[in-house]
Amino acid sequence: MKQFLNETVLRFITSSFIGTSFWCVFVYLPNAAFSILLFGILCTILLVEWKNLFRLNDFWFWFIMPWYPILPFGIMIYMSSTPCYRTLIYYLFVIVFAFDSTAYVTGKLIGVRKIIPHISPGKTVEGCVGGFMGALVTFYLSIRYQQITMPVALMFALVFIVCAMAFVGDIFESFLKRKAHIKDSGNILPGHGGFLDRFDAVMMASFFFFLFRSELTNLLCVQI
């Protein structure tokens, strides 16, 4: 229990720092600043963390890299630098980070039923349900604050799809780490590991936001 509390506090401090930093850059600095921040994170992943998953001369090192992580980060950089899609990046991070955080805490506290123990033994049904509920509440409060109305069924569906894709992204990175026999992709973020560990879920969910960017913009059209 003491170890869980220490890990949770460390993750909370790191998450708070990341969240606050992202919010300040996103809201108070020019649009290009957030794109530069994302590009810097991508470069760190490629130059520092990616080689921990694959050998440099490995075919998969070069085959997977353009699709993951380069393409999803390219999507996020494009959308964050485009005024009409900028709001979507805000909600992408809100939903995924809320899902990640509450899924972790719920899973550690009451998680029993493992989902894919041979790939990611820490993922449980209870954690995923808790993560979904946490993301749903956070998203609801966010759109209420922005005075956006949305049918309940549509809100449930949107959050569920984003959380499902975030879960797939998390599992995919866990699979890569399992193959590489490592626990974390890096150690730059205390309590989380590397940037790839923190952004794996966001990267996968970004595909959904990009594919349905026009429809989502009509729903979430308030500029942040």
Label every model-predicted segment:
Residues 179-201:
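Interfacial loop-to-transmembrane junctions
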Residues 2-164:
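Membrane-embedded alpha-helical bundles of polytopic integral membrane proteins
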Residues 198-214:
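Final/C-terminal transmembrane alpha-helix of multipass membrane proteins
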Residues 211-224:
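Juxtamembrane boundary at the C-terminal end of a transmembrane helix
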Residues 104, 174-182:
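Juxtamembrane interface at the ends
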Residues 1-4, 42, 184-191:
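Juxtamembrane loop-helix boundary motifs flanking transmembrane segments in multi-pass membrane proteins
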